[in-house]
Amino acid sequence: MPGEKSTTNLLRRVREEELPLTLVIINAAAEMYRGAIPRDCWHEPYMSDRELDEEIRAGVEFWGYEQQGRLVGVMGTQAVRDVDLIRHAYVLPSCQGQGVGGALIAHLRDLSARRMLVGTWAAASWAIRFYERHSFQLLEPEMTRRLLQAYWRIGERQIETSVVLANPPYQ
């Protein structure tokens, strides 16, 4: 009926006009990193408009989870040579623990026929557990370093303080 709120949940690409909301979601959820990741790696905002634009220009495609007509979670993918990277996976704090992130990652895995890699902060134990619950395997430090150097455009400090998880795992 007109005027009623939708009770359906929807997985879809994030629309251009939702990029400001995407930043709100990313920066709100990234607050969990404050005090957990090395102090010299934290900055405010965690992601700026400029950084989001750069990520999109570099090929990151954002998918969103809409709950009752409201975007509450985002997760990006980026095709890099022979793999797909999971990039910038964030859910509004008030919606965490409700299956939003799990639905997003399952959807992105369904869309990809290639190995998927995700990098996150080594100190973000909650993020590592999330990816492990969704069949990603934490890789050894030597392999992590090689993959971060090969597939991501990040500085040495971030390489030193990050981990990589893979699905399917490397043998």
Model-derived segments and spans:
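Terminal substrate-recognition subdomain of acyl/acetyltransferases
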Residues: 2, 118, 133, 137, ...
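A short beta-loop-alpha structural element at the N-terminal edge
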Residues: 10-24
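Conserved GNAT-fold acetyl-CoA-binding loop/helix
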Residues: 27-52
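A short helix-loop-beta-strand connector motif used in the catalytic cores of GNAT acetyltransferases and
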Residues: 50-64, 158-161
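Conserved beta-strand in the GNAT
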Residues: 64, 70-78, 85-90
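A short, internal acetyl-CoA/4′-phosphopantetheine-binding micro-motif in the GNAT/acyltransferase core
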Residues: 89-96, 120-122
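Conserved acetyl-CoA-binding loop-helix of GNAT-fold acetyltransferases
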Residues: 91, 97-110, 133
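Conserved beta-strand-loop-alpha-helix junction that forms the acyl-donor binding cleft
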Residues: 118-128, 144-149
